[in-house]
């Protein structure tokens, strides 16, 4: 008899175990698919950031416009983020994420399309390409050439083709579409993950997710490094006819290849989400035997949430309920402080990262390929390790909400302190005759002064808009052979095989020759290696606290409002940080330019040369200005968090058990959505 009853119970238990297994397998598949989508999302972001300088040169636009293009991703995200976050949680979240990944892939491919319609890239005037020895490049006494640029007839003729430069608008549209597609991935993905993870494992899953996502930036940096060394029109022109190198300020790599690869990967990542369930199967009893992830609420919060729940039951997607929910999070003092704090921090991060590669190129004389490779190989693995370590520390020591705030405050303070060490590493301006030095290469000049012609080139009637830099034997770079006073040349138009002679402005122990290309900056090589070490250190401490920031956000609001809170947070961050930060960073950087290119229409194009010192102080100073207020706001955040949870300490719950870790709600189940092993379930409500 007993044996028969045991067999019957075992038979009844088997389907539950099978259902639980399917549930766990579905969660693991979702976690794997979400990780892949995070990789693709991060890959696309790095590809855009690392291509900023090349996009500026290809479309002949200033940094403020390239900042707008970069902010297009956030503009697209901004258009739909709130509605996706609020209404998306009530729909099929995995399928919405899949649709988003597909749209993100289409947007990435659209970004690359202008390359195929713009024609070949012309890095110099057509008549200059034909012959290096013509009168526009070398100095011929009393030649009839305008010193300020080409004639109006030439400008008007070239301006018809110049209309293609407006193709950058399609790059902006593609980036906006990529932002729209990315919208559901973070709020819906993390809320789905939090709903169905095992109890106490949310922080660990988030740390793992962000660590795996670091594969995307690594691939992005390596891929961008490889493609940056490939000429933009590879496959269309004879590469032997290209006389510029990656060290030249006019060089444009195959930036479009990175976007095509990323687009195909994003489309592939969308496929698994269409085969995942809306909600994993679970019994009603499991739903009843679970409690909220959020900490016990005060009586006022309970009453408020009861009213919200009643309204949601009447019409879960009406606008009145949305506005009431929005008001609920905006009256949460912890949430508002956290919102302002992260807005400033993220603005500094987005703005600095957008122009990080330009900073390295201009400050230390490195190519885009070298900057991408080193950052991808060294910095990104360090950040991945720091993110995983940060998530592990929070879980291992079971940090409360106050503890998490203190932990992030510590990591942010250390990273902030190390940033002051960047300033001694700034390099001096490039020795550039006519821009930072007089034309004889002897005396420095202020960058805002229009340097007058010297005795050595005043009779050459040179075109000052001409950009064909040469390196003199005296170590000074000249804008063109004509402005160096060179009378003759020998070579095959290649940088290492072309020499200019009889250069009256060059004086170096009787040797007055020069070769094609800019002079290298050997003095900054040591500073660059110290910069990399410092960058790794700052990145480590910055990344260590990033997973914990998400936990502070989720624990500051009621569980029912998590998706909306994350969505509204993303809305503000993207509107005021993601969109505006690259634009005003770009505007600050444009003010440090001392030599602009001239478009075929005679208008200002991309910057050829920056004042290195002014660039460095503007870039680093703006970073510190945005990251100083958050340190004080962390103190305020800790104070309000302590005050909120102090009144809940050691409160006796309705079932007679005490909640001893109210500041650590991560150790509590969320509405029965967690994958609790069958043999661990009991008749008691798990806390």
UniProtKB/Swiss-Prot annotation:
Pfam families: Kazal_2 (PF07648), OATP (PF03137)
Record-listed Phosphothreonine modification sites: 660
Residues with glycosylation annotation: 134, 496, 511
GO biological process: bile acid and bile salt transport; liver development; monoatomic ion transport; oligopeptide transport; response to cytokine; response to glucocorticoid; response to lipid; response to lipopolysaccharide
Cystine residue pairs: 456-486, 462-482, 471-505
Major subcellular location class: membrane
One MF term in the entry's GO annotations: oligopeptide transmembrane transporter activity
Keywords: Cell membrane, Disulfide bond, Glycoprotein, Ion transport, Membrane, Phosphoprotein, Transmembrane, Transmembrane helix, Transport
InterPro entries linked to this entry: Kazal_dom (IPR002350), Kazal_dom_sf (IPR036058), MFS_dom (IPR020846), MFS_trans_sf (IPR036259), OATP (IPR004156)
Any one annotated GO CC term: basolateral plasma membrane
Highest taxon in the source lineage: Eukaryota
Chain positions with Phosphoserine modification: 290, 292, 667
Record's keyword annotation contains Cell membrane: yes
PROSITE patterns: KAZAL_2, MFS
Main function: Mediates the Na(+)-independent uptake of organic anions such as taurochlate, bromosulfophthalein and steroid conjugates (estrone 3-sulfate, 17-beta-glucuronosyl estradiol, dehydroepiandrosterone sulfate). Also transports prostaglandin E2 and L-thyroxine (T4). Shows a pH-sensitive substrate specificity which may be ascribed to the protonation state of the binding site and leads to a stimulation of substrate transport in an acidic microenvironment. Hydrogencarbonate/HCO3(-) acts as the probable counteranion that exchanges for organic anions.
Domain remark in the UniProt entry: A conserved histidine residue in the third TMD (His-115) may play an essential role in the pH sensitivity of SLCO1B2/OATP1B2-mediated substrate transport.
Protein name (record): Solute carrier organic anion transporter family member 1B2
UniProt organism field: Rattus norvegicus
